[in-house]
A protein has these predicted regions:
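Structural alpha/beta core scaffold segments of enzyme domains
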Residues: 8, 14-269
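Positively charged, low-complexity/disordered segments
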Residues: 1-16, 270-273, 277-278
Length: 278
């Protein structure tokens, strides 16, 4: 075979079909609220901002580590560094085709996680090896293996467009989210796409998102999965818009903050007036 260059950039991957046979966009999301075109027509000022972020690993001190012990009664006990022992238990049962009641997962003292230990890696392997050998099996990743085989957060390309009136009321907000998922579909795009403008009271919103596969490790959660990357683009645009109309960025945010019962995409919004005590 002939080695080819990997497709690691989210924007490059969107335009190619080399990772998967059909296309590299695994999922497309579009969420609407109100009339986005009318909202921008009513705006006196419009700001657009584009940002790119790189994949970032959670950087926990303790690597993934598991001990599995298969007993003659057909049960398996797994001691592991995890943030989700019930999920791990269910996945081990599914992969090993065992009854859920035959598996016990004991979460050990966690040496850091930040979302990165929500995913199953070593546990089914240790459990299967223990079942085959009929002896306890311990597996620990090296730091190199952690970086190569576990999931970082998505690399992203995010675009935000926001318009407001002269008195500082946001009339429309639009965002495009392009999130790397790694070699397999399934990034934190859905959470990011449904919460991108959740902090604000905006009548006209359009959010378009793409889950893009590329030649990287499958991504995992990392501290408010998906939110920081799009927040970087949106909040930068908010700052620029506030400066453009001569309003303090904090006052601008408070003026447009979500209130009790504010309607937003898919979910009822948080109340900034209550949360901030204003």
């Amino acid at each position: 075979f002939q080695a080819e260059d990997g497709i690691r950039d989210v924007e490059r991957s969107r335009g190619l079909g080399d990772v998967y046979k059909r296309q590299n966009i695994a999922t497309r999301m579009e969420n609407k609220l109100g009339d986005i075109e009318d909202g921008f027509r009513k705006a006196d000022f419009i700001v657009e901002h584009e940002s790119n972020t790189k994949p970032t690993h959670q950087g926990y001190i303790e690597p993934q580590a598991s001990i599995a012990n298969y007993s003659e009664g057909g049960t398996i006990e797994v001691f592991t560094s995890t943030q989700g022992h019930h999920v791990f238990r269910a996945q081990i049962a599914k992969l090993l085709k065992m009854d859920l009641s035959k598996i016990k997962v004991v979460p050990a003292e966690l040496g850091g996680g930040f979302g990165g230990k929500n995913n199953v890696y070593l546990e089914p392997l240790a459990a299967q090896l223990s079942r085959k050998a009929n002896r306890p099996v311990k597996m620990v990743m090296t730091r190199d293996e952690v970086f190569r085989a576990t999931g970082p957060t998505s690399g992203t390309n995010c675009k935000a467009k926001i318009g407001c009136t002269k008195d500082g009321r946001i009339t429309a907000a639009q965002a495009e989210l392009n999130y790397q998922s790694g070699a397999f579909p399934g990034s934190s795009l859905p959470m990011a796409a449904t919460t991108v403008f959740k902090r604000y009271d905006i009548e006209n919103v359009l959010v378009i998102g793409h889950d893009v596969v590329c030649n990287r490790p499958k991504v995992a959660a990392y501290r408010a999965p998906g939110a920081p990357m799009i927040a970087f683009a949106v909040e930068t645009a908010i700052d620029e818009l506030a400066r453009k109309i001569g309003l303090d960025p904090l006052d601008f945010r408070l003026k447009n903050g979500a209130k009790q019962g504010t309607i937003c995409l898919l979910y009822t919004s948080d109340a900034a007036d209550e949360g901030l005590g204003v």
